[in-house]
């Protein structure tokens, strides 16, 4: 059995965070997710999942390329804290595009982290805004700022009828009502806050095992997240198949019962055969690990 065990103890919650520290925390989040094994259909230590154009080394190179950009997102958020949040997104886009270019250069043109750049760019800018305003760094405040930065992004970018061929994201929304990464950001990472973090925290508390907590959390994300990466590869049938298989494993106890890891490996093999990769859930898992390093805070920040 070939699995990667995450043995790192959870670090104390951050009450403050320098821009340079943010780069390191994001890099650790991305590498923790990438190296977690076994992950059904995803790149990990065991194999390259349903991907023929990337491997773990590509994810590690990509992380090295994009992590330094988080400081730039942080600074932009910090410098524009006096502006209405919805007016800042347009200023973050050039940073995101430049960061993506560095990723593609590091991976020879392979998209390893486009979704993660979007998520962590917003999170970094949100943290910069909070610190500029003297507000505490708490999960709910950070996510509330992300929601404010992303306000109306689904309506503006996915709902509007445009001339020419629809993008994949527009097709997913206009045909199936799936808003993908944009919808998750606009909701302030609702799936992470209401599903992933509670599972992660509970398993860590009950089992003192970050590796098991991350795998169990991934299963929950695969079971309930409407992952548009799966729709791109296998249509709604592919999405529903993965959700049903993950739910089945959870009903059996997931990775917390005997044989759970082997069941994850079997599902990995099945998703590879079907060319299915839950990349959106992988991004949310990295976000979950990242946010777990901050206190939860009040549910409704002022």
Curated annotation (Swiss-Prot):
It comes from the Bacteria. It is an enzyme of class 2 (transferase). Its EC number is 2.4.2.52. It catalyses: 3'-dephospho-CoA + ATP = 2'-(5''-triphospho-alpha-D-ribosyl)-3'-dephospho-CoA + adenine. One of its GO terms (molecular function) is ATP binding. The keyword Transcription regulation does not apply. The keyword S-adenosyl-L-methionine does not apply. GO terms for biological process: prosthetic group biosynthetic process. Keywords: ATP-binding, Nucleotide-binding, Transferase. Pfam families: CitG (PF01874). Belongs to the CitG/MdcB family. This is Probable 2-(5''-triphosphoribosyl)-3'-dephosphocoenzyme-A synthase 1. It comes from Salmonella typhi. The gene is citG1.
């Amino acid at each position: 059995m070939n699995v990667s065990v995450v043995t790192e103890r959870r670090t104390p919650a951050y009450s403050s965070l320098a821009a340079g520290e943010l780069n390191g925390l994001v890099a650790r989040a991305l590498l923790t997710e990438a190296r977690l094994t076994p992950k059904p259909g995803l790149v990990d230590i065991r194999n390259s999942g349903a991907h023929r154009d990337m491997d773990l080394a590509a994810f590690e190179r990509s992380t090295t390329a994009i992590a330094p950009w988080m400081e730039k997102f942080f600074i932009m958020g910090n410098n524009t804290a006096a502006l209405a949040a919805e007016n800042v997104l347009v200023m973050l886009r050039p940073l995101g595009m430049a960061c993506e270019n560095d990723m593609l250069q590091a991976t020879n043109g392979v998209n390893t982290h486009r979704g993660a750049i979007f998520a962590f760019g917003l999170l970094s800018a949100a943290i910069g805004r909070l610190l500029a305003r003297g507000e505490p760094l708490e999960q709910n405040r950070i996510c509330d700022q992300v929601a404010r930065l992303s306000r109306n992004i689904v309506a503006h970018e996915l709902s509007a009828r445009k001339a020419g061929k629809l993008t994949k994201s527009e097709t997913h929304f206009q045909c199936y009502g799936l808003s993908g990464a944009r919808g998750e950001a606009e909701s302030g990472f609702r799936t992470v806050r209401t599903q992933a973090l509670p599972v992660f925290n509970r398993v860590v508390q009950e089992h003192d095992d970050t590796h098991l907590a991350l795998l169990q959390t991934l299963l929950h994300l695969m079971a309930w997240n409407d992952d548009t990466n799966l729709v791109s590869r296998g249509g709604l049938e592919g999405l529903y198949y993965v959700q049903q298989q993950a739910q089945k494993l959870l009903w059996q106890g997931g990775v917390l019962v005997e044989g759970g890891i082997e069941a994850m490996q079997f599902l990995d093999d099945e998703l590879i055969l079907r060319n299915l990769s839950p990349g959106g859930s992988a991004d949310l898992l990295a976000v979950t690990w990242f946010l777990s390093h901050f206190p939860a805070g009040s549910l409704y920040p002022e």
